[in-house]
């Protein structure tokens, strides 16, 4: 039981730190893009015109007629309060007012891992007398928990529930299988 608790704590901490580092890097890249755009737009007429042409091309690629795309790009380059933010939003999909949050991502990851690990851990704690039943029950509860987490995340994100659930369960099966194989290889009792 103590090993299970340690595993959940270590896994949750690892996931949270990994998510924090990853999202921090993404946010740093977004900020660097904004600074580069601001510099480009302030570097002189030729540089500003190049940024405007690039933005017009983005809108042409999205289906606007060239003349209208040019008008949109000109307006976003010359007539809005924050041209760099407008370019970043339209060109790169970066919202300058709503950059990614490393702390929020880490907290969600920590919570998801902890909740995902709690159900199998509780199952193992309740079924202490029959190792075979405990092992099978933990596997089933783990898969049901994965399915529930996959469905919930798909629902919250507005994604197709079946596809997301299948992906999470398949990934979980692979992870469980790999963990079992490694444990068996090293002679760890996996029941």
What are these regions (language model features)?
Residues 1-22, 26:
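Internal alpha-helical transmembrane segments
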Residues 23-110:
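Cytosol/matrix-facing amphipathic helices and coiled-coil assembly/linker segments
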Residues 109-120:
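Core segments of transmembrane alpha-helices
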Residues 117, 167-180:
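Small-residue-rich segments of transmembrane alpha-helices in multi-pass membrane proteins
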Residues 119-124, 152:
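Generic transmembrane alpha-helix signature in multi-pass membrane proteins
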Residues 132-144:
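Structural signature of hydrophobic alpha-helical transmembrane segments
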Residues 148-173:
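Interfacial loop-to-transmembrane junctions
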Residues 180-191:
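Juxtamembrane boundary at the C-terminal end of a transmembrane helix
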């Amino acid at each position: 039981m103590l090993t299970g608790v340690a595993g959940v704590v270590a896994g949750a901490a690892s996931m949270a730190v990994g998510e924090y580092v990853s999202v921090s890097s993404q946010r740093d890249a977004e900020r660097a893009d904004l600074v580069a755009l601001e510099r480009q737009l302030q570097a002189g007429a030729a540089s500003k015109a190049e940024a405007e042409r690039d933005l017009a091309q983005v809108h042409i690629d999205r289906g606007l007629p060239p003349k209208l795309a040019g008008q949109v790009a000109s307006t976003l380059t010359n007539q809005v309060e924050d041209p760099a933010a407008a370019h970043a939003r339209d060109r790169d999909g970066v919202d300058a007012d709503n950059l990614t949050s490393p702390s929020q991502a880490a907290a969600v990851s920590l919570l998801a891992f902890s909740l995902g690990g709690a159900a199998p851990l509780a199952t193992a704690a309740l079924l202490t007398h029959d190792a075979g039943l405990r092992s099978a029950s933990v596997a089933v509860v783990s898969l049901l928990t994965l399915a529930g987490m996959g469905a919930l995340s798909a629902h919250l994100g507005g994604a197709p529930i079946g596809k997301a659930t299948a992906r999470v369960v398949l990934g979980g099966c692979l992870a469980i299988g790999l963990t079992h194989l490694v444990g068996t290889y090293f002679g760890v009792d996996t029941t």
